[in-house]
Amino acid sequence: MKAVLTRVSSASVSVDDEIVGAIDCPDTGGILALVGVGAADSDDAWETMVRKIAELRILDGEQSVSDVNAPVLLVSQFTLHGRTAKGRRPSWSDAAPGEVAEPVIEKIAQGLRERGITVEQGRFGAMMKVTSVNEGPFTVLVEC
């Protein structure tokens, strides 16, 4: 499982020009989490990802999402598993198929909510437009 976590002051995701998820957090900051589920991920990788999103100290002042009750915008991003070493067209064979990935993304969202974190989401499998105001910029790649 891979994720790109970006510290933001606001972020939104739209499908067909309709906003389906948004966070606005100029005081605490928040996290835009682009998460890709891999075909070879362990059954409990989602739990590690929940912990990383909630506890990594990547907000202002070395605070975590849990420390300051910051919101998360969670967007499924299978393209994080694209292989680009050969040729000009990425291979997506390392990404989990949709029927495997979608429930994992839902487990991550639920796991964050169970920690009391506000979670907004994109729409799985849809063509989405993601907008963000990055802070820093501060972006990290998480693999688990």
From Swiss-Prot:
The lineage of its organism: Bacteria, Bacillati, Actinomycetota, Actinomycetes, Mycobacteriales. GO terms for biological process: D-amino acid catabolic process. Belongs to the DTD family. One of its GO terms (cellular component) is cytoplasm. Keywords: Cytoplasm, Hydrolase, RNA-binding, tRNA-binding. CDD domains: Dtyr_deacylase. Pfam families: Tyr_Deacylase (PF02580). It is found in: Cytoplasm. It catalyses: glycyl-tRNA(Ala) + H2O = tRNA(Ala) + glycine + H(+); a D-aminoacyl-tRNA + H2O = a tRNA + a D-alpha-amino acid + H(+). An aminoacyl-tRNA editing enzyme that deacylates mischarged D-aminoacyl-tRNAs. Also deacylates mischarged glycyl-tRNA(Ala), protecting cells against glycine mischarging by AlaRS. Acts via tRNA-based rather than protein-based catalysis; rejects L-amino acids rather than detecting D-amino acids in the active site. By recycling D-aminoacyl-tRNA to D-amino acids and free tRNA molecules, this enzyme counteracts the toxicity associated with the formation of D-aminoacyl-tRNA entities in vivo and helps enforce protein L-homochirality. InterPro entries: Daa-tRNA_deacyls_DTD (IPR003732), DTD-like_sf (IPR023509). This is D-aminoacyl-tRNA deacylase. It comes from Corynebacterium glutamicum (strain ATCC 13032 / DSM 20300 / JCM 1318 / BCRC 11384 / CCUG 27702 / LMG 3730 / NBRC 12168 / NCIMB 10025 / NRRL B-2784 / 534). Its main location: cytoplasm. It is an enzyme of class 3 (hydrolase). GO terms for molecular function: D-tyrosyl-tRNA(Tyr) deacylase activity; Gly-tRNA(Ala) deacylase activity; Ser(Gly)-tRNA(Ala) hydrolase activity; tRNA binding. Homodimer. A Gly-cisPro motif from one monomer fits into the active site of the other monomer to allow specific chiral rejection of L-amino acids. Its EC number is 3.1.1.96. A motif (Gly-cisPro motif, important for rejection of L-amino acids) lies at residues 136-137. HAMAP family: Deacylase_Dtd.
